[in-house]
Amino acid sequence: ERILEAGLAVLKEDGYAGLTTSKVAARSGQNKALIAYHFGSKQGLVAAVAREVSAAITEELLEGIGEPRTVAGVARGVVDGVARIMERDEGLARLYFDLASHSIVEPEVRAIIAEMKQGYRDAVGLVLARVKDGPKRSSDADGAAVYLIACLEGLALEQLERGESPALQRAREMFVRSAPAAVTGVGS
């Protein structure tokens, strides 16, 4: 537990490139051999931290979404949930995008990000399957989950780059209004 907390703190402060087992050992009060024993490598530690963070974020988002009845309700829940999480701890979003950027060139990190995103898609897909105007086919539900998550990533990146702004608030509202048409294909 202390090692995972230290790993998360170092990742948020120094990023993936700056993470070393020496830094995690110093921060956790554990030795490098213990870290190697439990996690095998830097990538093993990063994967364990990412799983913990991903599970916590997913749980918080699902609690925040509640039991929406419409796609718009799902969109409202996830966009507000991500904004709340970022307001509380912007470092989590920085960590996510840092890992995503490294996933392009590092297969181990790509596997970590793929696992995280699959978990998000599965969770959003389950919520979409329960709403009255949600996708009827599983392939459409998969596409809808990818769409919603991609939009959330863009909004989160905008918040990281420029901070909270009236334009970002309007963009979130546009997302909530447009999500039902995009997900159900209405108007296409």
Segments (PLM) and residue ranges:
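Hydrophobic alpha-helical connector segments
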Residues: A48, E59-L92, A141-L148
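C-terminal peripheral helix-coil segments that are non-catalytic and often amphipathic
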Residues: R84, R121-A129, C151, E158-S188
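Helix-loop "lid/cap" segments that line or gate small-molecule binding pockets
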Residues: G64, D80-E87, R94-V105, S178, ...
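Amphipathic alpha-helical packing segments from all-alpha helical-bundle domains
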Residues: T58, R88-L95, P107-K132, G143-V146, ...
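Solvent-exposed, amphipathic alpha-helical segments
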Residues: A6-E13, E60-G64, L95, L99, ...
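Residues in soluble alpha-helical coiled-coils and helical-bundle/repeat scaffolds
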Residues: G29, G40-G44, A48, G66-T70, ...
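Helix-turn-helix
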Residues: R2, A6-G44, A48
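Short, basic, alpha-helical segments at the C-terminal edge of helix-turn-helix-like DNA-binding modules
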Residues: R51-A56
